[in-house]
Amino acid sequence: MSKKCMINRELKRIRVARKYAARRIELKTQMRDESLSPEERQRVMLKFHSLPRDSSPVRQRRRCRSTGRPRGYIRKFGLSRNRLREVAMRGDVPGLVKASW
């Protein structure tokens, strides 16, 4: 089980990224706009760099819903590999069976 502070930090990153998403897109399009003068583009770039670091969605890390484990995450189920194995062995995931050949 991950520390609660780590899970809360990830939730905060998600909130901040959603809050600044529109602003980031707007500033990025202005930075790429060739019709603006270099000084204006530089000013826009400074505004973009003044945004919080956590507003970037790249900084987010996917975590297991039940344990908060950051590694071995399987997107389809939203669980880590360890937790998915436990849940699958109990038969809680419909259609998921252990492979045998």
UniProtKB/Swiss-Prot annotation:
What residue spans carry the Basic residues bias annotation?
59-72
Could you tell me the keywords of this UniProt record? Ribonucleoprotein, Ribosomal protein, RNA-binding, rRNA-binding
- SUPFAM superfamilies in the record: Glucocorticoid receptor-like (DNA-binding domain) (SSF57716)
Cite a single GO BP annotation. Answer: translation
Single GO term (MF): structural constituent of ribosome
Nucleotide-binding found in the keyword field: no
Task: Name a single GO cellular component.
Answer: small ribosomal subunit
Source taxon at top rank: Bacteria
Q: What are the TM regions of this chain, as residue ranges?
A: none
The record's annotation in InterPro entries points to:
Ribosomal_uS14, Ribosomal_uS14_bac/plastid, Ribosomal_uS14_CS
Disordered: annotated segments: 52-72
One Pfam short name: Ribosomal_S14
The entry describes its oligomerization and partners as:
Part of the 30S ribosomal subunit. Contacts proteins S3 and S10.
Similarity section: Belongs to the universal ribosomal protein uS14 family.
Q: Give the function comment from the record.
A: Binds 16S rRNA, required for the assembly of 30S particles and may also be responsible for determining the conformation of the 16S rRNA at the A site.
Q: Kindly provide the name given to this protein in its UniProt entry.
A: Small ribosomal subunit protein uS14
The protein's organism comes out as: Nitrosococcus oceani (strain ATCC 19707 / BCRC 17464 / JCM 30415 / NCIMB 11848 / C-107)
User: What's the encoding gene here?
Assistant: rpsN
